[in-house]
Amino acid sequence: TSFENFAECPLRYYLRYGVDLKEREEFTFSPVNFGVVLHAVIREVCDEIKKNGESYYLISEEKRREMVKRSVAAITDIYQNSILKDSSRNSFMIKRMEDLADRTIWAMGEQLKCGDFVPFVFEHKFNMEVGDGDRKQLMSGTIDRVDICENDTDVYVRIIDYKTGKKDFNIVKTYYGIDIQLMVYMEAAMKLVAKMRPGKNVLPAGVFYYNISDPIVSATNES
């Protein structure tokens, strides 16, 4: 993200990452906070399902829902006493968070059921050197989800990046260095998989944005 900011506006990059200017913190739960908590809940529940050796698409709805509620309660308690419980609006946001996380994990299971990919890691943090000679840069980030599909000789890697807002991949922006996030994630993920699966060919399969939403279909009485 910081590299994309530099490509768009070097001054903005300097003010944000050089001078470390930040907006004044307010006692409120922002959309950014909402996305951070939602990501954390999805990661925690998916990790628990994997740790228990359960299937993402065979787990019962009741058990999945209970795991989501427990995770949301634990994570939102971090917001001291709690900013999320000081109004009816924020209480509604907690309920919405539960619904979105539950639907996302359910949808993930349905998608996995239709293919051969399986989740490899969630929320993978990485540090990676890029460049050559004296022109090297350290790139760091967090990949929401890495899936793999493997046989005796090859491992295919797929990147899933969760977004709470609308985000489309644009190859032109990637060319100009404005939208490189998924490409960097793939490079980092392939290095991770190569280390964990020595002796196998590691191949890129695809990079995808996953829009976290609870869509409502509009319809007239006639339709």
Q: Which residue ranges define each predicted feature?
A:
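Non-catalytic protein-protein interaction segments used by genome-maintenance enzymes to assemble
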Residues: 119-194
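Active-site-proximal structural scaffolding
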Residues: 7-8, 27-35, 61, 65, ...
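C-terminal, charged and often intrinsically disordered regions of DNA end-processing helicases
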Residues: 1-44, 48
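A non-catalytic, helix-rich entry segment at domain boundaries
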Residues: 40-125, 129-130
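Substrate-binding beta-hairpin/strand module that engages nucleic acids
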Residues: 54-59, 158, 186-223
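Beta-sheet entry/capping signal
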Residues: 3, 10-12, 118-120, 144, ...
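Active-site-adjacent bridging/hinge elements
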Residues: 7-19, 69-77, 153-164
